[in-house]
Amino acid sequence: MAENPLALLEGTWQGPGHGSYPTIVPFTYDETVTFTALPGKPVLAYTQRTTSAMGLPLHAESGYLRLSGEDRAEFVVAQPTGVTETHTGTARQDPSGAVVIDLHSTNVGLTPGAKEVSAVTRRLRIDGDELTYEVGMAAVGQTDTAHLTATLRRVTD
């Protein structure tokens, strides 16, 4: 695997995404994600913003991604919807040379006004200047179901 797989994520990424869930109408969005290194720390700060085709804000989240050991990853995420996620998982290199980070929630926190979310899974795949991801979610009475997919291109280092 790359000496520091987190370094492969550093920069700003943009591209289109698609969302669906059994309780909502499918939708598309434009996304900007930024991963910023914290000097001297094995961690990246994370920010994400999505907009509609007309440029209206849809969703945002922020957090931190870090490695804990050679192939272990941890991710914490906070959303303005009142949902927080704590994830653990693995970082590995697949046969093509891409780095894959598989994460599953170990805790989902909810404010009193947040919609019910009981579990979240995230998979990130970094292959050069392309970042793809998949998000699954168990929420509002549904079991773990695919929710979001996107393919982003690096726009800055």
Region roles according to the model:
Residues 1-157:
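Hydrophobic small-molecule pocket/channel-lining residues, especially in calycin-type beta-barrels
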